[in-house]
Design a protein with these regions (language model features):
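Conserved Rossmann-fold NAD(P)-dependent oxidoreductase catalytic core, especially the SDR/UDP-sugar
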Residues: 4-46
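Conserved C-terminal active-site "lid" loop/helix of NAD(P)H-dependent oxidoreductases
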Residues: 123-140, 155-182
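Flexible, glycine-rich beta-alpha linker
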Residues: 29, 46, 50, 68-91
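Alpha-helical substrate-binding/gating segment
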Residues: 16, 77-84, 94-116, 123
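Catalytic helix-loop patch of NAD(P)-dependent Rossmann-fold dehydrogenases
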Residues: 34-70
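Conserved catalytic Lys-bearing alpha helix of Rossmann-like short-chain dehydrogenase/reductases
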Residues: 3-9, 18, 54-62, 100
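Core catalytic loop region at the nicotinamide-binding pocket of NAD(P)H-dependent oxidoreductases
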Residues: 72-73, 107-132, 136-137, 141
Length: 184
């Protein structure tokens, strides 16, 4: 779906004259960066698995259709969009529903969008991503994952310092197998 479906989406947009798309990419397009790396919209892809690779493909299609046909796309590398962070890694990657809704409003109400990469996160302490390159959108996330840290600390232990969830931006996706079975 992330390969053929994205191509079909952009072809349909081209054929019907649609001029703007919000592409739901993912933090897993850059998941093999370490949590000590601070990324901006110029960071090269480092997918952490085949899912991340499929999102990089979608970002490339968005760029191609912008350059070739003028279809504007907000490439939103969504961190974690849930009512609240589900684990300690998500304290940095979390995006509230309110902040996502505000981002959508900005994307579809600005006169000229282009084809920017936007990190879909709230205004979290300890975030790994920099959206200053897309300040022209006027999006100002207001929520912060830190408000959930105390309840997370009570519910679960923090990951060990060498665990993928504590080392890589993509967390455990970096160790998921990309083959069908152990015999492959």
């Amino acid at each position: 779906a992330n390969i053929e479906g994205v191509y079909n989406l952009y072809e349909a947009a081209r054929k019907t004259g649609c001029t703007r798309i919000l592409f739901a990419s993912s933090n897993h397009a850059v998941g093999f960066y370490k949590q000590t790396d601070y990324l901006d919209d110029k960071a090269l892809p480092r997918p952490d698995g085949l899912y991340g690779v499929s999102k990089v493909f979608g970002e490339a299609i968005a760029s191609l259709y912008h350059d070739k046909f003028g279809i504007e796309t907000a490439i939103v590398r969504i961190g974690s969009c849930f009512p609240e962070p589900k684990n300690h890694r998500m304290l940095a990657t979390w995006m509230s529903y309110d902040d996502f809704t505000a981002l959508i409003d900005c994307i579809f109400n600005i006169s000229q969008l282009g084809c920017p990469i936007i990190y879909g996160i709230s205004d979290n302490d300890g975030k790994w991503w920099d959206n200053s390159g897309t300040a022209y959108l006027g999006w100002q996330p207001k929520d912060n994952g830190r408000n959930f840290q105390e309840s997370l600390d009570k519910r679960m232990e923090r990951p060990k310092p060498d665990a993928p969830d504590a080392v890589y931006q993509g967390g455990y996706f970096t160790v998921d197998p990309i083959y069908a079975s152990e015999d492959d």
